[in-house]
């Protein structure tokens, strides 16, 4: 009998796409949290506020990368237990990981409130936007617990094959976020603080909704009194996946943050262009990123069930799908780069538009590289080799950072060199990851 959310049965391509589609839509909606702030702030307040929100978002993603890494790693453990049909181990891992990530969230919150000023100074944030960025981050981290709760339960539901429910709660949250943005900024004139408050309140609604749904509608995922213990084997398994995934996310976002610091040194105009272009860039490749996350769940369930033949066929299907989709998006971004920038920037800000268009056309040409890399990350996490995902991340981000600083120091290249360093890092990591896959495939029979 086919279990609800079982990815070990049925047609591979259809199963993957059916599971992925709600995740893709949900991920695009997730981007709307920050894009709504960026669009309304950029059009209603100005370029300085746009630069502040964009730079704050990059820092925020880096700081919560620990939480995201822990939830992603825990999600892989949940998928393995669900695929193997071990519900006792599943419930115990849910309890243990929830407590662990909750403690980390509290520590992170305290750390941010203590060290927010030294961090902003280290990033060379210009004085004209320093106050706005400080206020925005302070409010956002007051509600970081909502980010933890929503992402934890969304990861849990996706791990057991339910990618639709998180989408519904996220959709309600995004609509509320946009409505509150308009109300707080246009009606109450709260400025950038209003944008941050809108995001926190909207995330709170999503968090409350998803936790109530899980406890009422999915009793098999509700831990019991006997599950509320820190089993050594369970904790070791969670730590094995979560720690390395956490390191991967931290390294990834540290590299991005270092590049952000370099971009900041070129002034407010380049910062604003980068902020707007990165939102478009993230929006463009986010579907294939979620496809990689869905692919990881698919591989983990089949690995737990011992379906190695299905894993091999799934790899081929996923790579073809990712490449075709990435090529289509590359063409669209290249052609419509300037109109896309005008969504966030006023037409008279020509310097910002020109810098942003250059970024998008360089990045957009190489979306196949990042699409393949997301699949490789997901594959290695799912087959109990999360360390390989870390290696690929270090390769990709290390190349990006080194080349960014080198190219930017050459006057003839300047800021454009930063844009070129990003796809070069993707392609180098792809080559290494594919070569290692051929070896692992032979050894593990997958």
Each language-model region and where it sits:
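Short alpha-helical transmembrane segments in multi-pass integral membrane proteins
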Residues: 1-20, 78-143, 187-243, 299-366, ...
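Residue-level signal for short hydrophobic patches within transmembrane helices
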Residues: 9, 13-32, 36, 59, ...
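Transmembrane helical elements of multi-pass membrane transporters/channels
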Residues: 18-37, 139, 150, 173, ...
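Generic alpha-helical transmembrane segments of integral inner-membrane proteins
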Residues: 24, 28, 32, 36, ...
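Helix-terminus/linker motif at the lipid-water interface of multi-pass membrane proteins
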Residues: 28, 32-50, 120-127, 183-190, ...
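Small-residue hotspots at the loop-to-helix junctions and early N-terminal turns
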Residues: 47-58, 137, 196, 268-283, ...
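Small-residue-rich hydrophobic transmembrane alpha-helices
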Residues: 50-110, 147-166, 273-337, 370-384, ...
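Short runs within selected transmembrane alpha-helices of multi-pass transporters and secretion channels
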Residues: 71, 139-158, 166-174, 195-210, ...
